[in-house]
Amino acid sequence: MREVKDTKDICKIEDVEERVYHSFRVYRRLPFDAPKDYACYLGRFIKTDVNDIQEHERFIGRDIALAEEVGVEWWHDMPVDIEDKTLICFRCGAPAGTAGYWSGVRSWKSVAAEFHIHRNTAKNRWNTAMKAIFEYVCRLNCA
């Protein structure tokens, strides 16, 4: 597995792809339910009455922080339409489309079958989305 780069260190599309894959790998392993009076912030249980802690201080571990950045900060603002976001989720193994379960990275054949498109069309949509995300990240780095 390649090393996952921080946003400021991303310099090519492959770095963006690795961050997206990494984010879904981290999310796949996190618990969903928290005990009473606790909230689950990406795998770490925090008492809900603790409001004075800064949001970024609640997270532990570099992997979780990087996954949270993709899932929270990038995801809603990146210039990719909802259909391609669903394709990204499905390819990365998230419960998307008709698959209601987590898995590893799905094959292009599975992605094509799910979206009723040719395998090369699925790859092209993926590549176009990754280019758009890369340009978005470059704008973040320049700001």
Where do the PLM segments sit?
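N-terminal interaction/assembly modules
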Residues: 1-77, 109-110, 135-143
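Residue-level detector of well-ordered alpha-helical segments, enriched
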Residues: 15, 19, 83-87, 125
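Short helix-coil-helix linker/hinge
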Residues: 76-86, 94
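Helix-turn-helix DNA-binding module
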Residues: 95-118
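DNA-recognition helix of helix-turn-helix
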Residues: 113-139
